[in-house]
Amino acid sequence: MKQLTALLLVLALVFSLSACGAGNNNSGNTTENTSQETTPPEPEPEPEPEPEPYDIYDPTVMPEGGTRDGVTYVAYDGIVEHLFIHPVIAYPELAFDGDSQEKGLDDYMITATEYQRILESVYERGYVLVDIADVWSETTDESGNPVMVRNTLYLPEGKKPLILSYDDTNYYEYMLTNGFAYKLILDEDGKIASWGKDPQGNEVVSRDLDAIPMLDKFVEEHPDFSPFGAKACLSVTGYEGILGYRTQTDSTIQWTDEMEAYRQSEIQAVKPIIAELKRTGWTFGSHTFGHIRLGTLSMEKIQRDTQRWFDEVGSLVGPTNVLFYPHGERPDGDDWKTTGPVFQYLQSQGFRILCSVGIESFSYIKKDICAVICDRLHPDGTTLRSKYVDQRYGQFYDVREIIDLDARPDYGVNWQ
């Protein structure tokens, strides 16, 4: 009986304490408001899926002449061919419409169809993509002085190395009405694609109308074309932004808060594009900020332009040691026979691989300064129509299988 009484007293005490607790939770009210419903917590957002890794290998050390995945790799110290193009023409009917820009576009551009044919041809002829930064590297000589050296590449047996570079991948304003893509975006699968408008004004997202996503797609279909994960080096200016995004400032007009807000929004929009390009084997080089002439412009203007490239472009794409001469114009008139003040300045700013344009894939390691100079070949309208095309480009393709004479204006050809 005493045990039962004690148990009842304990239960009464528990209920009493519970009532006190409830009263404290309701700011002194002794009765609970049972009509109020508790709001459930917001569900945690699902994390963004991490992009799958993209394997990028160093051809100078992997696999050092051994085998990987059943493929034998052998040392290669021969010529490394280098081709460059400008943005490709997606809609020839807009480019070749008889206006004042038609001849220039025919001279210096290729169509998306021609570009696809070139990729197929160099692939069939045994070329594989390599990163320009893997071909030459900086080291020190026996005296401790910095020097550039040509690296031995280890390639799949029977293959030949090919560097690709794409100039002016900025998608300038004039291009938007002349049949080019407008900009790069990430498509619904997170892959690099182009965005633009067709001749009827319809918005088009595609991986078949611009050189960059087209190469991505080609490598997906032919992974042995890029055994080390390399794609191409994008040679960018900055005076009309980069990759189709207007990230530039403009000192020639009064810069307003609205302009700066738009610029900042473009900067934020292009960052994931840059990140995905770099993740998937693309690299960046300078084409100067204003596409300037390095052979004739004053040192003061060259210095100002270079700093602006670092501030507005390099700050987004990251550091680079590659410079592509606009117009192919060499600093100080001749960067091979002389090492003049402009070349010395550019080298002092970190550029070690400096590329012009020529009739062969020429390269020369400078003896008096830590730098290498290169010439690149240029598939475009001038060379596709040239009488020298077989002599200079025959190792890459048969021009008769490349040029799209049905799409181009009738300017004739100089080969049989």
List PLM regions with ranges.
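Metal-dependent polysaccharide deacetylase catalytic core of the NodB/CE4 family, i.e.
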Residues: L83-A95, G144, M148, L155-L162, ...
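N-terminal, intrinsically disordered, polar/charged segments of Gram-positive cell-envelope systems
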Residues: N24-G70
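Sec-dependent signal peptide recognition
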Residues: K2-V10
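C-terminal motif of bacterial Sec signal peptides marking the signal peptidase cleavage site
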Residues: S16-A19
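C-terminal active-site subregion of NodB/CE4 polysaccharide deacetylases
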Residues: P51-I132, M148-L164, E173-L176, T283, ...
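Membrane/wall-proximal cationic-aromatic binding patches
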Residues: L129, V135-P146
